[in-house]
Amino acid sequence: MISKIRIFIAVTIMLSASGCGLIFIGAENVGETIFSSPQKVKSKVKNPIKPEVKLSALWIGHSSVLLQIYDKVLLLDPVFNNVISGVMTRKQTAAFDIDDLPKLDMILVSHAHMDHLSISTLADLEEKFASAKLIFPEGTEEFLPGYDFEFIRLKTGNSFKKNYIGGSEIIDSVKITAVYALHYGGRFGLDSYVWQMPGCTGYIIEYKDITVFYGGDTAYDDKAFKRIGEKFDIDLALIPIGPCRDCEEISNFSHVTSYGALLMFDDLKADNMIPVHYGALTYRRDPDFPLLVLKDLIEKNDNTNSMAGIDRKYSERIKILDEGEQMVFEYIEIKN
């Protein structure tokens, strides 16, 4: 108990100095952080990797996703902590056990904020999968200890001058490309929102005939995501939908909202979308509020399209997963 209180006080002082809204989030969560524990997740997939799968995604919670593309296994922004940054307790435990994962090829980190980069989660993964590659944007290395992972640092593409596309690497036949994200690097509040340190990115993951977009944290941009959608033929887009106070605005500060996520989905021209970055943590209102708004927007859009005779519906292409749920999008075709 004492250690939790000390952590909270230290982080509160730090966030107060930063002048950012995180101090209010911390204050509103302090009671839960000190006096409560997250609920246990209802179900976990015990055998997440299957040889017959071409593309699957398992939503672990918040922004953490386990991807299988053919024989390759990737973790995106893995954060399995119950308490994040000392001031935020998860609603429920991360919907995944490392012991249930038989292999891991790559870990992709979008930026160093504490709800996306967990030092302890990476240490746990390192114990079992030290040969995995750790991929991150330039600037994030400042916050990484000396893991045994092979580090792969990518230049970001967060500007019009860079055509919204950053560096890329081919790793074990998987091409990873950094793409535009309108957010911040840094880790502790002051370095992010005052000094505006670089070090954030989205990703395009290409392997064989499958392409996946992962947005990390980002606000909306009416040119960048159109450009990405023109350049890549995206099968699946993992798009954040929160946090947001007014989720029918396009963006707030440095996060896309539920409405903005639909605009991103349209711009990217992706076949399917999974919404992420909601549900696990409380950001000054109901953590599921972005999802409620998204569902309402989907229903309104589909009703309008039906009246106009348009068959292409969001409800058929946007897959809303429970934490711990895995969706298989395609299976490998077995030829007789």
Language model features with spans:
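Active-site-proximal loop/helix segment associated with metal-binding centers of metalloenzymes
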Residues: 175-207, 232, 236-238
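Active-site HxH/HxHxD metal-binding segment of metal-dependent hydrolases
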Residues: 95-167, 182-185
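Beta-strand-turn-beta hairpins that frame and shape the catalytic cleft
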Residues: 50-55, 68-74, 167-177, 206-212
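Pre-active-site segment of Zn-dependent metallo-hydrolases
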Residues: 39-49, 60, 69-112, 119-127, ...
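Bacterial N-terminal signal peptides
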Residues: 8-17
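Cap/insert and terminal regions of metallo-dependent hydrolase folds
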Residues: 106, 133-135, 139, 219-322
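Active-site metal-binding loops of divalent metal-dependent hydrolases
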Residues: 63, 78-81, 111-112, 139-140, ...
